[in-house]
A protein has these predicted regions:
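Loop-to-transmembrane helix boundary motifs in multi-pass membrane proteins
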Residues: 117-121, 161-170, 265-296, 364-399, ...
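Helix-loop-helix junctions that connect adjacent transmembrane segments
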Residues: 195, 199-252
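Extracellular/periplasmic helix-exit of transmembrane alpha-helices
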Residues: 206-219, 269-275, 287-323
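C-terminal membrane-solvent junction of multi-pass transporters and transport-like membrane proteins
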Residues: 223-224, 374-383, 417-462, 484-504
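Transmembrane-helix boundary/entry motifs in multi-pass membrane transporters
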Residues: 37, 48, 97, 101-134, ...
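Membrane-interface "cap" regions at the ends of multi-pass membrane proteins
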Residues: 1-62, 111-113, 117-125
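Cytosolic C-terminal regulatory domains/tails of membrane transporters and channels
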Residues: 1-38, 487-651
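Extracellular loop-to-transmembrane helix junctions
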Residues: 64-113, 119-125, 140-172, 196, ...
Length: 651
């Protein structure tokens, strides 16, 4: 490629762009530079579990209250349905996702392989829109909920009652600061928060179960009220199946669980292509998190339903949004209750950490590769700043209101889980695994039902998700438009025959003819040479090599280029290339030939028929169009020095 001198980067720029070369490419950089850069070897799976666990486990702060409001006395039964869906549905789905897509791209990567060209890109952008909805709302909703707990604390209410927006924005900014410091620090903080929070919840659960046992009448009162309200067990189960989608926030941790996979430490010596240790340990991570959460969901739903009066769950009630905190204060005293409050506020604030980690693993692996984000979007720290600013905007739009964001959050979670279920169903069918295919198909139907019910009840979630999708698609297409003339070939490799052709003509003036392959018969090449000679008034003795580019997938942006040489009809030398864009491939070849030979190559075109605008659209969408001027523009951007720029001739 073009070798242009650049001043050494500033310390701030170097710090901001640290890790740029290997983000989103799935492998470490090669060469001397790679040796200087520290390699993130990952963390043990149980520590990474805490990074996704701050999102997953923190829902205990509000899940029992949501279940009680949604299902009333049926809350424990509806929660059991949710746990069955978790362990028999979401868990096997995401264990398979971890196996099929072990680089943090989740089910989106699996579905991407099924669709090609622009329809595949638009489909991925739509799923990324829902992922952004899920992850960003996780950040803003959790921070807002933490600030709500803080503001509603009896000791702080008078001082903070009108400061919720400021507190929420401060918590989001602090979260961004942790990630600017680095992933290891985020995992360390998450490990401490989750450990303390689960221990405190275990104490509350044991205390609650003790009071259920010692106050035997509460069980009798509950079963009597259930029978009076619903009649028999079959009606209860039927109603529980109808209301359980309202409890879907309890499924929030799975997508982030596979999104943070790259941070799981693998076995010594394993490769990125076959990370068996990472896959095995991520399955442990998912299973352990699901089992822990299931135990807490059932026990907390049971004790809160039996021990807390129903009116306290209503808006304005003492247990509204803080059911377990209510029990902590009620049965373990205000000192323990205050410690529990602090732990809950801390984990709710940091719940956005797993979402931020998911965004940082997901977005840089797609958008820059599609040419739909700047090159620096592959680096971690600039993206942290971008996501933090977007979280500020979302918080401001929703006025830091937890309830207003709930619909969007649940919709994002359920759409991603449904897409994952469909992806593994297709994978099982392709692998010829009939039993798994049937099982995953049933799971897909369950999650699609849950999603539809949720959308009907909370249509605002789809509207907000649609805004994210529209925003991502619009920004992505604008970015692709602005980067249209970039040299987007990452490497050029010539086979032996191609290298021989280049060496041969380097002793004379290097002249290439850009040829659109048609029948590739002898007459095609003979007529093309004659036309180029006449158009450019070149003498008979001038030597030429043909260059032919076949467009593969024009929706792709960056890729390596392989150049193959062949002799056609025992006379005409032809270099053949495959690329997403003809002008980019030709420009990359010319710059490579210049750099390897030290000579300025010339390339000859004929004008393309059609209007400039129509030809630009053909180039933008299909990689073709008016090749000559676009090739020249790509060369101009890649090599500012006219004296060193390959020459483009058109006739």
């Amino acid at each position: 490629m073009a070798t242009t001198e650049h001043p050494p980067p500033s310390r701030l720029r170097a710090w901001m762009l640290e890790g740029l070369s290997d983000m989103g490419k799935g492998h470490a950089p090669k060469g001397a530079q790679a040796e200087k850069e520290p390699v993130d070897e990952g963390q043990p799976w149980y520590r990474v579990m805490c990074l996704t666990g701050v999102d997953y486990f923190s829902t205990l702060g509000y899940q029992p209250g949501i279940a009680a409001l949604a299902a009333g006395l049926l809350s424990p039964i509806a929660t059991i349905v949710l746990v069955i869906v978790t362990l028999a549905g979401a868990l096997p789905v995401y264990r398979r996702v971890a196996e099929e897509s072990p680089h943090g791209q989740g089910s989106i990567a699996m579905l991407e392989r099924l669709l090609t060209f622009w329809k595949g890109k638009l489909f991925v952008l739509t799923l990324l829109g829902f992922a952004a909805t899920d992850f960003l709302i996780t950040i803003t909703l959790s921070a807002a909920d933490a600030s709500t707990h803080l503001v509603e604390n009896p000791h702080l209410n008078s001082a903070l009652h009108d400061k919720q927006m400021v507190i929420t924005l401060t918590l989001v900014a602090l979260l961004g600061a942790v990630f600017l410091k680095g992933f290891l620090e985020a995992i360390g903080v998450a490990f401490a928060l989750v450990g303390v929070y689960l221990a405190l919840n275990a104490v509350v659960v044991v205390s609650g179960l003790y009071h259920v046992v010692t106050e035997g009448h509460v069980v009798t009162d509950w079963t009597t009220a259930l029978t009076a309200e619903h009649g028999n067990i079959f009606v209860m189960i039927g109603v529980a199946l109808i209301v359980f989608p309202k409890l879907a926030l309890g499924l929030s941790g799975f997508e982030t669980g596979v999104a943070v996979m790259p941070h799981v430490k693998g076995d010594p010596g394993e490769t990125e292509e076959k990370p068996k240790g990472r896959i095995r340990d991520t399955k442990k991570l998912l299973t352990t998190a699901a089992v822990i959460m299931s135990c807490f969901l059932i026990t907390t739903s049971f004790i809160t339903t039996l021990l807390i009066p129903e009116k306290e769950f209503e808006p304005g009630g003492e247990a509204n949004g803080r059911a377990l905190a209510f029990l902590a204060h009620e049965y373990l005293g205000n000192a323990f209750g205050t410690v529990y409050d602090v732990s809950t506020i801390a984990i709710l604030w940091f719940a956005g950490a797993s979402a931020m980690a998911g965004l940082l693993n997901l977005m840089p692996r797609y958008l820059p590769r599609y040419g739909m984000a700047p090159h620096w979007a592959r680096a971690v720290r600039p993206m942290v700043i971008v996501f933090t600013l977007v979280a500020f905007l979302v918080t401001w739009i929703f006025d830091a209101d937890v309830d207003a964001q709930g619909g969007a959050y649940a919709t994002g979670v359920l759409v991603l889980i449904s897409s994952a279920a469909i992806a593994v169903t297709i994978a099982a069918r392709k692998a010829g695994q009939r039993n798994w295919f049937i099982g995953f198909a049933v799971i897909s139907v369950v999650f699609l039902y849950t999603t539809v019910v949720n959308v009907i009840e909370r249509p605002d979630g789809v509207k907000i998700g649609a805004c994210f999708i529209a925003g991502i698609i619009l920004i992505s297409l604008l970015s692709r438009l602005l980067r249209a003339f970039e040299l987007r070939v990452t490497s050029v490799t010539l086979d032996d025959m191609a290298e021989r052709f280049v060496r041969d003509i380097a002793s004379r003036k290097i002249r290439f003819i850009a040829n659109e392959p048609d029948s590739r018969d002898k007459a095609e090449y003979r007529d093309k040479i004659e036309q180029i000679r006449q158009d450019n008034d070149l003498p008979e003795q001038e030597d030429f090599v043909f260059v032919e580019v076949t467009v593969t997938d024009p929706s792709e942006f960056e890729a390596g280029l392989t150049v193959r040489g062949q002799v056609m009809h025992n006379r005409y030398r032809v270099l053949t290339l495959e690329s997403s864009s003809i002008p980019n491939a030709l420009a990359a070849l010319l710059l490579n030939v210049r750099d390897t030979t030290g000579c300025i190559p010339h390339i000859y075109f004929e004008w393309t028929e059609g209007t400039p605008f129509a030809n630009f659209l053909r180039f933008f969408l299909f990689g073709q169009g008016e090749v000559a001027p676009v090739t020249r523009e790509v060369l101009r951007e890649a090599e500012p020095d006219r004296d060193h720029r390959p020459r483009v001739h058109t006739g």
